[in-house]
């Protein structure tokens, strides 16, 4: 049985009065992580060798996820970088690249794969899980606006620049909710009940409205304190991820 599609998912993109200035404090989150016992594996469950594919956010590349990558490896998981390139292209193209990486990780480990996506990367992860649930052990989103894009005006301006570039390739609806590609239709689809979810958010998010980053379900939504940018290096987020992965084991298929 599938869970409901994201409630209130909006196809348009709207500005949100979020505190962008707070993102300048992201360095404090990184320092807090380094000072936290969770960063060194204290008080969290060990991994079982299952794969976890990390997906970067809008305009980002895999490289800023290396801190999270190393931490997961130290815990005993088998992390993979997404290999999608810069997250500033046609969503369907990015989704196909992500699928290739997930299939590689699935074949190497012989079991479904965890997906951990930051911001727009989490939306790509949810879309893939909805379309190919047999490949996915669980989905973790970190500040991902999967209920509709409500962002700071400067973020929407950057999105429009990407859209203009893609339009030159004769894809007028790309980077909008009106696109009917598999990536967008997958985001609108119901998430299968077989795929456990974790939605990490912060009410001090300076990039997106935190209200579009949650399922409105206390069983899946976890609030942390910090910035949007540094959700990939937030001690509260790391603790929630470790707890979620330990609970979300999927059996190895024959």
Task: Describe the residue ranges of each PLM region.
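Flexible, membrane-associating and regulatory peripheral segments of lipid-active enzymes
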Residues: 1-53, 64-70, 75, 108, ...
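Generic, low-specificity signal for short hydrophobic/alpha-helical stretches with a mild N-terminal bias
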Residues: 6, 10-13, 37, 47-50, ...
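Generic structural signal for short, flexible, solvent-exposed coil/loop and linker residues
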Residues: 9, 19-22, 44-48, 54, ...
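Contiguous hydrophobic segments
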Residues: 16-37, 43, 117-133, 145, ...
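Residue-level signal for well-ordered alpha-helical segments
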Residues: 29-35, 42-45, 49, 56, ...
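Serine-dependent carboxylesterase/thioesterase catalytic core
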Residues: 51-63, 67, 73-188
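Helical cap/lid subdomain of alpha/beta-hydrolase-fold lipid enzymes
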Residues: 130-254
């Amino acid at each position: 049985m599938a869970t409901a599609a994201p409630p209130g998912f909006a196809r348009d993109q709207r500005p949100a009065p979020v505190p962008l200035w707070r993102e300048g404090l992201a360095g404090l989150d990184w320092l807090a992580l380094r000072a936290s016992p969770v960063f060194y594996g204290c008080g969290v469950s060990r991994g079982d060798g299952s794969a976890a594919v990390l997906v970067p956010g809008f305009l980002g590349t895999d490289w800023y996820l290396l801190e999270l990558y190393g931490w997961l490896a130290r815990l005993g998981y088998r992390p993979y970088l997404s290999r999608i390139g810069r997250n500033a292209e046609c969503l369907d193209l990015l989704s196909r690249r992500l699928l290739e990486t997930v299939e590689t990780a699935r074949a190497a480990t012989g079991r479904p794969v965890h997906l951990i996506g930051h911001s727009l990367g989490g939306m790509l992860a949810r879309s893939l899980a909805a379309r190919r649930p047999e490949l996915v052990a669980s989905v973790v989103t970190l500040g991902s606006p999967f209920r509709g894009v409500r962002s700071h005006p400067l973020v929407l301006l950057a999105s429009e620049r990407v859209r203009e570039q893609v339009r030159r390739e004769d894809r007028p609806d790309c980077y909008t909710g009106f696109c009917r590609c598999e990536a967008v239709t997958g985001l609108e689809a119901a998430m299968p009940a077989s795929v456990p979810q974790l939605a990490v958010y912060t009410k001090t998010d300076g990039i997106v409205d935190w209200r579009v980053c949650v399922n409105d379900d206390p069983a899946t939504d976890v609030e942390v304190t910090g910035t949007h940018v540094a959700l990939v290096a937030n001690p509260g987020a790391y603790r929630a991820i470790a707890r979620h992965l330990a609970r979300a084991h999927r059996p190895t298929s024959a």
